[in-house]
Amino acid sequence: MIYMVSVSMMVLVLGLVAVASNPSPFYAALGLVLAAGAGCLVIVSFGSSFLSIVLFLIYLGGMLVVFAYSAARAKPYPEAWGSWSVVFYVLVYLIGVLVWYLFLGGVEVDGMNKSSELGSYVMRGDWVGVALMYSCWWVIIVYWWVSIIINFVCGIWVNSKSMWWESSCV
């Protein structure tokens, strides 16, 4: 079980690196599906299979909408995985993850159960995660304010741009 969680975490990081380093939405969608699947495997390993399936279906629906929009706005001949800029970004991100893991010690979340095989924790991981989320109430308020500001700024930015059909008229 510990090996499954470790491999799923590595696949999750590789999927996120694939999304962050690729300029083309066609290939980045593959990284998103990989990251979503690996994240849901991590959730399943903590004992919450129903939550994992629901999150995976919701996430795939959201990715479908975003992929359809970004594929419509993409260049007709996108850069592939082998182009030098993509390889450079992949190496930079992987070196950053490696440096973060080696020098900062990785991630340790207090209160979460590491595995059901260890036997030292009796609470399920999803309930402890909810308790940890609500124990830092100020973080939720900060996230709420940031989301309101982002929605306000994006709304002003979208309204200030001309629509694509207005500029293509002859």
UniProtKB/Swiss-Prot annotation:
UniProt superkingdom: Eukaryota
Entry keywords, A to Z: Electron transport, Membrane, Mitochondrion, Mitochondrion inner membrane, NAD, Respiratory chain, Translocase, Transmembrane, Transmembrane helix, Transport, Ubiquinone
Transmembrane parts of this sequence: 1-21, 26-46, 49-69, 86-106, 138-158
InterPro entries tied to this protein: ComplexI_Subunit6, NADH_UbQ/plastoQ_OxRdtase_su6, Nuo/plastoQ_OxRdtase_6_NuoJ
A single BP term in Gene Ontology: mitochondrial respiratory chain complex I assembly
EC assignment: 7.1.1.2
Pfam families recorded: Oxidored_q3
UniProt key word Hydrolase: no
Catalytic activity: a ubiquinone + NADH + 5 H(+)(in) = a ubiquinol + NAD(+) + 4 H(+)(out)
Assembly and interaction partners: Core subunit of respiratory chain NADH dehydrogenase (Complex I) which is composed of 45 different subunits.
Record's function text: Core subunit of the mitochondrial membrane respiratory chain NADH dehydrogenase (Complex I) which catalyzes electron transfer from NADH through the respiratory chain, using ubiquinone as an electron acceptor. Essential for the catalytic activity and assembly of complex I.
Family: Belongs to the complex I subunit 6 family.
Protein name: NADH-ubiquinone oxidoreductase chain 6
